[in-house]
Amino acid sequence: WLLDISFKKGDVIYIQKKNNNYIINQEPKVNGAIIVLDPYTGDVLALSGGYSFKKSEFNRVTQAKRQPGSAFKPIVYLAALNEGYSPATLILDAPYVVDQGPGLPKWKPSNYTDEFYGLTTMRTGIEKSRNLMTVRLANRIGMNKILSMANNFDINEGLDENLSMSLGSGVVTLIELTKAYAIIANGGKKIEPKLITSIYSKDGNKIYDTRL
């Protein structure tokens, strides 16, 4: 249900060959970031904090605080499972309105499709990333339980106790979010991202190894 409009037919991207690899040869208008993490060992297999360290030393993996959006929803559903809910639990997918107080507009979250689906299982809710189900579920179990679950994944900052947090309106770093997903993939066992796995002396002798 997502449409990728980043590229279209006829677009030209300039690249150059370097050391048997191809790299982009034009400066992008925006910077991105990526981290590849082994969920079982914590080893960082790849990391790029931006297009050019020379042009910007700001590391967008470890320093940039960004809204995770729907990527935060698994934390909500894990909190629900921890409270006794199951994948088969039915949650109403219907309009939801929050009164934010005097002088403030009412908050009316919506699904990506702008449609409503009635009673739906939690499993479908996370699978289809349903906003209205997630907000209703968050209100039912309490945002304090969700923030507590986030803390279990070492996401401790940038979150407030309001319902919009359940849809990822807080801020996290990419490495924090990736670590949280790694913990899920690792069956709930916590890991720490390791940027260095071993160090060798100039003579080739190993003087440090994270596995020892």
Walk through the language-model features, giving the residues of each:
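Beta-lactamase-like hydrolase cores
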Residues: 2-38, 123-126, 139
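Short, charged, amphipathic alpha-helices and their helix-cap/turn boundaries
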Residues: 141-157
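Active-site-proximal helix/loop microenvironment
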Residues: 152-207
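A short, well-structured edge-of-sheet supersecondary motif
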Residues: 26-54, 149, 195-201
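Active-site SXXK
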Residues: 41-42, 62-93, 125, 180-184
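Conserved catalytic neighborhood of penicillin-recognizing serine enzymes
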Residues: 40, 85-146, 190, 202-212
